[in-house]
Amino acid sequence: MKTRKKGIIFFALVAGIMLASGITIAIPGKSSEDNDLEVFVAGDGYTDDERPQFCGTNDKAKSTDFVTEFKIPTACTQPLAITTEPNGTVWFAQTNTGNIAKFDPLTEKFTEYTNPRWVAAESQLKQKLRSMMWGMDYSPDGAIWYTDEATDSIWRFSIADETYNTINFPISEDISSLPQKLVIDGSNVIVNDFTGGKLTIFSYSQDSLSYASIPSALDGFTSDFAIDSENNIWYTNWNSDGTGILIKFNYKEWESQLSISSQADSGLFLQDFIQFFQFPSGMAAPNGVSVGPNQNIWIVDTTSSYFFSFDPVTEEFTKYVTSVPTIDSYGNASGFIKSPISRPYWIEHSGDNLVMNEQTANRIGVFNPSTETLVEYTIPSRNPNWSDCEGIEYCGVAQVFDFAIDGKKIWFTEWVENNIGVVDTSIPLPFSIDIDTKEITLEKGETTVVTLQVTSNRSMVSALELLLPTNVNYSTTSTFSDITIKPELNDFSLLSEVTTISVEVAASEHALSGTHKVLLGAYTNDIAISQFITVTIV
């Protein structure tokens, strides 16, 4: 692992960049505001063969008891970043049109705002433009900010004026750049540069920006970030080989010292403001980061089904696992998939809970760290072109790449189904679960039995769902079959008010000593409800 030298200096560039003068897309020899240009009609940019994969396979939005989808009026917009205003209005970026759009949950009406700079650029280039816009946030001055990786730009859309302005994201000539997630923090706009290996903090005032770029400690990816109650920024810095660190950056102290150093014309050194912690086993691509209840740091790993907590006091990581994806998500028409994974992508804190999008499970998970209960809501639309679905009718994923939390509602985008949707977590659940123990200690080769009790909330379940099987759910953080789980039955009916199931939990004779999490519960087509128990092998 190559580590940056300790003598790195923060490049605090007080550039006073005017938003109105920002360059949207650099096109040599032509102005992006040239009104004499012939408008280039690019369409959606996909061939007939490509269109089902990227634009959607379902003409209508779908719904469940907990999830409602809404079809975007313009075809093939490929929605990605999403946020909400305090009044509940939903905003999202369209990666295949260059526009942003809003959705009014009360009227269920979409409004899409044409980006004239994008249209002009397509006309000049005579080609379709497309960009992954990963980050979006609302600022209290009535604007929507979002990132644009294709043009290395940050956009600001004025809600009152309905106008787009942009600035160029600071880049180095010899390093690629990918502005990704974006957070408004007071008068600052914070953006991580995923491939450029830095955080950039823009200070916004009176239509101008100054910025400071904070280099990462390692030459590698700089992913998502979160701010704790003491104004520390936590973010991950990692390499594709799975090595990396969790970084704690003293944001408050840096801001204070930055003002002093600017006046004294001196530099600031990275090592004076950071602490870092080596990744635990199993963490390979930690994209999403959040500060949860009790100020613990939560991280999701996109190469697996794992998510982790980090206690800043004890400096210890704890590994958790989502449910195993259902076969509807991955298909397995070829028969080659032996260990399907859910790929949790981003994670956010909301009240007592944490919310994560499970990309390849086509679910949104809501985890309560206090009770260690995980509720996973199934997204009803599926696109078979992203999974092993040949010959399978209902199969695939909608590529839910982003979500935004507004009270009890979780809004999300479906990148390949041209939908936005909402999970209503206020709706009562169809059943509850209880496990007779929360902790188990096993010797190697030992087996014990725990009792899983499922209580049906029959008033919340339709007659059809009562007849459909409910399945026992289980997964574990252990590897190499160190722990095996065997329920006495695999499915049951919610017709019974209470169903009691014995579950064998066994430690292999060759298991390594250690502490693991085991997830037990039940699931239907629409929802999974589970709880963790802690298993220690001695």
Question: Where are the regions a protein language model picked out?
Answer:
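Short loop/turn segments that connect beta-strands within beta-propeller blades
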Residues: D104-E108, S158-E162, S203-D207, N250-W254, ...
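Blade/loop signatures of beta-propeller domains
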Residues: E33-F66, S259-G267
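Beta-rich, blade/repeat-based domains predominating
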Residues: A75-P86, V119-P140, S172-G186, A217-E230, ...
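Conserved beta-strand positions in repeat-built beta-propeller and related beta-rich domains
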Residues: F92-N96, L129, Y146-A150, V191-G196, ...
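Beta-strand-rich domains and repeat architectures in extracellular enzymes and scaffolds
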Residues: D48, K71-N99
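Blade-level signature of beta-propeller repeat domains, shared across WD40, Kelch, NHL, RCC1
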Residues: G391-P430
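Secretory targeting signatures
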Residues: M1-V39, L520, V538
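Long beta-sheet-rich domains in secretory-pathway and surface-associated proteins
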Residues: I427-V538
